[in-house]
Amino acid sequence: MNFNHVPVLLEETIDSLNIKEDGIYVDCTLGGAGHSSEILKKLSKKGRLIGIDQDINAIKAAKERLKDYENVTYVHNNFYNLASILDELNVDKVDGILMDLGVSSYQLDTPERGFSYMKDAMLDMRMNTENGISAYDVVNGYSEDDLFRIIKDYGEERFSRKIAKAIVKERNEKPVETTLELVKIIKDVIPMKFQQGGHPAKKTFQAIRIEVNHELEILNKTVEDGVNYLNPNGRISVITFHSLEDRIIKTKFKELENPCTCPKEFPICVCGKKPVVKVVTRKPIEPNEFERENNSRSRSSKLRVAQKI
């Protein structure tokens, strides 16, 4: 198992967490442990890292990479369940939380996982291969209207209606089973002049992956739960990879910083809702030119940080 995954915005993310050597930190997306290994280097033996991942292969790879550290707790679970995970571990408060929302290099580069539009494989795209619906179920089971909705909303694809219609037409003849079968359907309906700026299947694959893994639905809850468990001055750092995720994080941080619901004309707040965090990054931190050139998967990444009041 080759779980090589180059962490994006590594230095910026570690700096953003303001790591205390005796603190407790949660990596909600452990992956290949690129970020976690750097966190551990800054922790004393009294410090603790809790690493969560819903991909069992990520957990196995991280255990191997971090085998020299005894202050790591590994949790095979979805970070949606962050609150119950911390409760089960009898952890009342933590000093920092990291979420890296990108698909790992391992997942993209392992054809049988079905994430990549560059390699042929059965349609799958499940982060946790042990449960949930797969990309095959979405492509072959959703109505045309539902396919249109997710490709439009989650992929921001201008040809979403044409793609949805073409998928339904194709599957009426026979099921769409593989990634490259789906790629061909997409390519056939997108005009050639619109196939120049990036792979034509990228947005549709993103949309289906988000649907399969409920990626956007779980973000708001996880951020809110995470902030509740932060110590004062503790930080939550979130790396996003597309505008939908970034918008959700930006909006949620703003809501937590200014939760007041009083009408603007009220001279003072009477709703009683107090700020929970201070937003550290008014504009997201993005990779520098060197990282963009040397790690193509970093190019769309953005880091946003908030600090518990």
Swiss-Prot record:
- Report the locations given in the UniProt record: Cytoplasm
Q: Which reaction does it catalyse?
A: cytidine(1402) in 16S rRNA + S-adenosyl-L-methionine = N(4)-methylcytidine(1402) in 16S rRNA + S-adenosyl-L-homocysteine + H(+)
ATP-binding among the record's keywords? no
EC assignment? 2.1.1.199
Q: Which residues bind S-adenosyl-L-methionine?
A: 33-35, 53, 79, 100, 107
User: According to its UniProt record, which protein family does this protein belong to?
Assistant: Belongs to the methyltransferase superfamily. RsmH family.
> PANTHER family per the record?
12S RRNA N4-METHYLCYTIDINE METHYLTRANSFERASE, S-ADENOSYL-METHYLTRANSFERASE MRAW
Protein name, please? Ribosomal RNA small subunit methyltransferase H
Which organism encodes this protein? Clostridium novyi (strain NT)
